[in-house]
From Swiss-Prot:
Entry function: RNA-binding component of the eukaryotic translation initiation factor 3 (eIF-3) complex, which is involved in protein synthesis of a specialized repertoire of mRNAs and, together with other initiation factors, stimulates binding of mRNA and methionyl-tRNAi to the 40S ribosome. The eIF-3 complex specifically targets and initiates translation of a subset of mRNAs involved in cell proliferation.
Descriptive protein name: Eukaryotic translation initiation factor 3 subunit B
Organism: Sclerotinia sclerotiorum (strain ATCC 18683 / 1980 / Ss-1) (White mold)
Keyword Nucleotide-binding: no
Gene: prt1
InterPro entries named in the record: EIF3B, eIF3B_RRM, Nucleotide-bd_a/b_plait_sf, RBD_domain_sf, RRM_dom, TIF_beta_prop-like, WD40/YVTN_repeat-like_dom_sf
Segments of skewed composition (Acidic residues): 11-20
Compositional bias (Basic and acidic residues): 699-714
Record note on quaternary structure: Component of the eukaryotic translation initiation factor 3 (eIF-3) complex.
Family per record: Belongs to the eIF-3 subunit B family.
Length: 744
């Protein structure tokens, strides 16, 4: 029978009632927030209790706070009074726009009104939305406490399971990220190998606790023996990250401003919309504050006459050594110092410094002579402005005391170089001649820990310094100079490498800095000190023509030249090496090994890595297809006191005997393992051959043939006439002595 409307049920006879359908969960989930007339209202709680007589005074006092974030007036504040003539300790306030109401909630919530009262500010629409009937359960329900699960030890890698104190490194190639134990000459031992672990690059945290992976959605931190995810920071399209020295905080930056849609964001708020930088608390995973990019002043223009945008300075936010402050430079005008973790501006104002070009925190808390309370220290420099000279300054934080200033003249540029212990600050000053056609460099060295911070000038340098590096935890330095104008050319300029150290003085003082030696006619452009000092590599990187590496020892134990008797160094070239297309050179954190690598990010020729010991002897050479990145895993600072470290150095020869024996045993066991493996392979082959021969002999017997195919020939030779044997005689001549005479 064909279907028709006659077969449809009568709506009036339907068994269900629409009013009985419960769709509250759907309404709550898909509720659309419409523009309301109450969006300009806020509710202020936490006010003191007043009566009709004192109410106007409170409103007048409150207006001072309210007007700091928007426009409101006395008539826009409604403070209800109860039947007993006293207020209910809250008030309704109307602003001129919803944006001002939102700003009031952010700026005034939690602000103390006086010693006994703290303001709590919320939007009126939020109270209606979250506080309506049914949203809050009147009956207390105890929170569900999850069962305790022990977390992995994030520094377990420091206890090498092999007991050899090995270091780890991460390698990024193609789309794979691998972490290995370094086994010196032997192949590295793989720990973890994952594909698509990151989308752009990987980065260790400063103390090696976390491995950072970069994604379009944000940043993730990994660690522990099982390499599980420890934290995630949802900053869309993130490009760069920077950790604080103590791994407490993290800065993320994206060239795309943050965009918060109507659906919101899991970690960021509407206030973060349009920002580029976010500073996070690593322990909680929460954002502390966000910032927008600053437009850097440009000194050049393009072909159309428009100013050329300068590249961002990274890191834009620089950390103090104790993780208590982070500062940002507004080039040409000020330095803003923020206190952590609240991220409030120190003393509620930026430090105004006219013309300031750059600044840098001391990498350690300097213990200055004659100062009882040690504070953090940063240095800055300003160029010549009008008739005012250029200036270098040291400022103490949080007191903002200017510890030392130095006036400079004819300055073209300056670079700030802190020594790792903050004992010294070297300001590399490029000065121009009166005609401004030539440049020369001087080094202004601040002795930060000495009383009054004296400054020593090294002005014996005739050429322009293109690279400078302090010895870590030491007082020696290396510079690279050139007489040519450095430009982006395929042929690197000719350079000179110079070494400096203090001269010997009586007592514990440090003498004046003296020149040790200069090596000319080089192509070197990079300096890499061992993290433990003493050894240094001078190399040529990112070059298409030259890729030399020279390994120097600053404390050579051999004979010292007479000219260096009064110096605190004995310089010796230990070894030279070359690595075609080398782009990166990295010391391991113990200063025992050096990895050199050629990354596909720079070129596609012979990508891979080489491994050397500190003396420059090559241990491994590993070509790696689509090689991108190599990074040693950093180590945290030692827990040993200075006395314990001194005791270890004193007994180092005794410890070395044990380590040498372990190395010898390991080498012998490795050789024994190779011999055993080869013997096992030979035995297997001999057994296989015996089985095959047995099978062949059985097949010959079945075919009626002798077991040995050579048996007929052997029988014939045995029955032959022995008289017909042929005797063969061989004569061999041997030269005993050879002389040559010339006959005239």
């Amino acid at each position: 029978m064909a279907p028709s409307f006659d077969h449809l049920p009568d709506p009036e006879e339907d068994e269900y009632d629409e009013e009985e359908l419960d769709i509250s969960d759907l309404r709550e989930r898909f509720e659309v927030q419409l523009e309301q007339g109450l969006d300009t209202f806020v509710v202020i709680d936490g006010l003191p209790e007043v009566n009709e007589d004192t109410k106007p005074k409170l409103i007048k006092f409150l207006l001072r706070k309210l007007d700091s974030v928007g426009q409101t007036k006395k008539d826009s504040i409604h403070m209800p009074i109860g039947p007993d003539g006293k207020s209910f300790k809250f008030a309704f306030v109307e602003y001129s726009s919803p944006a001002e109401a939102i700003a009031a909630c952010k700026a005034l919530d939690g602000v103390p009104l006086d010693k006994k009262h703290t303001l709590r500010v919320n939007k009126l629409t939020d109270i209606d939305r979250y506080g309506r009937e049914g949203r809050i359960d009147e009956n207390y329900t105890p929170p569900k406490i999850e069962e305790f699960t022990e977390k992995e030890h994030l520094r377990s890698w420091l206890a090498d399971p092999a007991g050899r104190g090995r270091d780890q490194f991460v390698m990024y190639k193609d789309d794979r990220v691998q972490v290995f134990w370094n086994n010196e000459k032997d192949a590295p031992e793989s720990i973890v190998d994952r594909q698509h672990w990151t989308e752009s690059f990987v980065q260790w945290s400063p103390q090696g606790t976390f491995l950072t992976s970069m994604h379009q959605q944000g940043v993730q931190l990994w660690g522990g023996p099982s390499w599980t995810r420890q934290k995630r920071f949802a900053h869309p399209f993130v490009n760069l990250v920077d950790f604080s020295p103590g791994e407490k905080y993290l800065t993320t930056w994206s060239n795309r401003p943050i965009s918060i849609g109507e659906e919101g964001h899991p970690a960021l708020s509407v206030d973060d919309d349009g920002k580029n930088y976010v500073i996070w608390d690593i322990e909680t995973g929460l954002p502390l504050r966000s910032f927008a990019n600053l437009d850097l002043p440009s000194n050049s223009v393009d072909a159309e006459g428009n100013p050329v945008k300068r590249k961002i300075q990274w890191p834009a936010f620089k950390w103090s050594s104790d993780d208590k402050y982070v500062a940002r430079l507004t080039q040409g005008s000020s330095i803003s110092v923020y206190e952590l973790p609240r991220m409030n501006l120190l003393d509620k104002t930026s430090i105004k410094i006219d013309g300031v070009m750059d600044f840098d925190w001391a990498p350690a808390t300097p213990h200055r002579e004659g100062v009882k309370n040690y504070e953090q220290l940063f240095c800055y420099w300003t160029p010549e402005i009008g008739s005012n000279p250029a200036k270098v300054g040291l400022m103490s934080i949080p007191s903002k005391e200017v510890v030392r200033t130095l006036n400079l003249f004819s300055v073209t540029d300056a670079k700030l170089h802190w020594q790792s212990d903050a004992s010294y600050l070297c300001v590399k000053v490029d000065r121009h001649s009166k005609s401004k056609k030539s440049l020369a460099t001087s080094l202004e060295i601040f002795r930060v820990k000495e009383k009054g911070v004296p400054v020593e000038v090294v002005d014996s340098i005739k050429d322009t310094v293109i690279n400078f590096a302090w010895e870590p935890k030491g007082d020696r330095f290396v510079i690279i100079t050139t007489a040519e104008v450095v430009a982006a050319t395929a042929v690197p300029p000719k350079t000179s490498v110079s070494f400096f150290c203090p001269e010997k003085v009586k007592g514990n003082g440090v003498g004046n800095f003296k020149h040790i030696r200069t090596y000319d006619k080089k192509n070197s452009n990079a300096i890499y000190w061992s993290p433990k000092g003493r050894f240094v590599i001078v190399a040529t990187v990112h070059s298409q023509q030259s890729f030399d590496m020279e390994f120097y020892d600053m404390d050579f134990e051999g004979e010292k030249p007479e000219s260096d008797k009064d110096l605190t160094a004995n310089l010796q070239l230990m070894n030279t090496a070359d690595h075609y297309g080398v782009t990166d050179i990295d010391w391991d954190p113990t200063g025992r090994f050096v990895a050199t690598s050629a990354s596909i990010w720079k070129h596609t020729m012979e990508n891979g890595y080489h491994l050397y010991d500190f003396k420059g002897e090559q241990l491994r050479e590993e070509p790696v297809e689509k090689f991108k990145q190599w990074l040693w895993r950093p180590r945290p600072p030692t827990l040993l006191s200075k006395e314990e470290q001194k005791q270890i150095r004193k007994n180092l020869r005794e410890y070395s005997k044990v380590f040498d024996q372990e190395d010898a045993d390991r080498g012998a066991s490795a050789d024994l393992a190779v011999v055993e493996h080869r013997r096992r392979l030979l035995d297997e082959w001999l057994a296989w051959r015996a089985n095959i021969e047995e099978d062949v002999q059985a097949e010959r017997e079945d075919a009626g043939l002798p077991r040995d195919p050579l048996e007929p020939l052997k029988s014939k030779m045995a029955s032959g006439d022995e008289g017909q044997a042929i005797e063969i005689e061989e004569i061999v001549e041997e030269i005993v002595e050879e002389t040559e005479e010339i006959i005239s």
